[in-house]
């Protein structure tokens, strides 16, 4: 009756539903989607936003209601700013929920380095979990500005926000250490500045000099084409004193046909 919606990502941020598609869908499918979501008992929403990620411009379409403003994601005791009408990432990744939960439970007493921090939700979670300090590094000033707001509205202190091109700033980053916990959560492809297959190992090989004994690395990988073995092999080759300990998948891995094609979060400890 409803058709196949496996090519869509549907996220619910009450009172808004955000639908993301990477290929064009016809009007009939859009109408069917609205009907389907409207038929679900107890699913209350005022706005339905379609984000067309296959387009670079003019890629937001409002299927129901109006464009949302002042939107937030709520997780645990935290609140994060969202921009649900943006043509790019909305400012928060639901699939990283288990990673934030791990930080709340394990970051106490640690000095944290958060590389590719984006809007800094991992820093907020770490500080909520008792981290002593969290240094957030990203090359996007607007993302860091949102990160600062996320910290203020969650009443956490101890964060620093540094606007660096990470691949060109290892010396300065290392000087601010040493660190007890390093988070690496890069985009798969950030144009000329970072590509996972080309550049991830360059960060890994710098870890020994910037970390304390017993330090933990939270290494994230979100490429559908690269599995956990990519990171495990890279650590063995470029930072063999870091031993693999555990792995988490996306918060929605039980819905995925192959969790290895989604978010992978691997933890390594320095011997």
Model segments located where?
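Conserved SAM-binding motif I beta-strand of class I
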Residues: 133-138
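S-adenosyl-L-methionine
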Residues: 139-183
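Class I S-adenosyl-L-methionine
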Residues: 228-271
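Conserved class I S-adenosyl-L-methionine
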Residues: 109-118
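Non-catalytic substrate-recognition/targeting regions of SAM-dependent transferases
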Residues: 4, 9-11, 27-93, 101
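S-adenosylmethionine
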Residues: 166-169, 173-240
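Conserved SAM-binding loop of SAM-dependent methyltransferases across substrates and taxa
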Residues: 119-131
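Conserved alpha-helix/loop element of class I SAM-dependent methyltransferases that forms part
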Residues: 94-110
């Amino acid at each position: 009756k409803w058709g196949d919606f496996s090519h869509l990502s549907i996220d619910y941020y009450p009172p808004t539903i955000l639908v993301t598609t990477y290929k064009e869908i016809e009007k009939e499918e859009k109408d069917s989607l609205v009907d389907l979501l409207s038929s679900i008992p107890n699913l209350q929403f005022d706005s339905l936003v379609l984000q067309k990620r296959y387009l670079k411009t003019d890629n937001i379409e409002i299927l129901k209601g109006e464009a949302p403003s002042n939107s937030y994601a709520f997780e645990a005791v935290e609140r994060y700013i969202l921009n649900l009408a943006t043509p790019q990432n909305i400012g928060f990744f639901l699939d990283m929920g288990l990673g934030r939960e791990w930080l709340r439970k394990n970051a106490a007493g640690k000095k944290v380095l958060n590389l590719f921090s984006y809007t800094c939700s991992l820093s907020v979670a770490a500080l909520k979990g008792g981290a002593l300090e969290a240094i957030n590094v990203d090359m996007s000033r607007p993302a860091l500005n949102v990160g600062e707001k996320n910290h203020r509205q969650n009443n956490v202190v101890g964060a620093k926000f540094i606007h660096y091109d990470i691949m060109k700033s290892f010396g300065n980053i290392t000087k601010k250490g040493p660190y007890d916990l390093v988070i690496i959560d890069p985009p798969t492809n950030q144009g000329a500045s970072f590509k996972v297959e080309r550049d991830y190992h360059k960060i890994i090989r710098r870890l020994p000099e910037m970390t304390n004994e017993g330090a933990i690395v939270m290494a994230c990988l979100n490429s559908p084409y690269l599995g956990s073995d990519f990171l495990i092999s890279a650590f063995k080759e470029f930072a063999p004193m870091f031993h693999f300990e555990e792995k988490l998948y996306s918060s929605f891995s039980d819905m995925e046909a192959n969790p290895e094609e989604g978010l992978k979060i691997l933890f390594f400890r320095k011997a």
